[in-house]
């Protein structure tokens, strides 16, 4: 199985909590993959927050594409800037804050454990 995804045709939408926007480029329900559960982008505006959350059934990787901010994992605050990647085992609370005056764009990947 394979799929071509025209991500430029997929809009960002408000994330239900916090102040981030999310673009869900590929998910199990949209591309039919089995263990790969999500791939997309987060746009966190200046002063915005992608709230802390957990998902014990999935692992996640964040990759900062542009901007800077803080990635929180448990009680650790990680200074995030372009090119930084962070792996999180989903049972650990994690989220992202943008305390700057420029947008922060983060690529995320979820894989089912």
Stretch-by-stretch model annotation:
Residues 68-70, 77, 93, 103:
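Structural motif
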Residues 1-37:
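A short, N-terminal "cap"/entry segment at the start of jelly-roll beta-barrel domains
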Residues 87, 102-113:
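A short hydrophobic beta-strand segment most commonly corresponding to one strand
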Residues 41-45, 55-71:
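Short, conserved beta-strand element in jelly-roll/cupin
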Residues 96-99:
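Asparagine-centered strand-capping/turn motif at beta-strand->loop junctions
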Residues 75-90:
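Short acidic-glycine-tyrosine-enriched beta hairpin
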Residues 24-28, 40-55:
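Conserved short histidine dyad/triad with adjacent acidic residue
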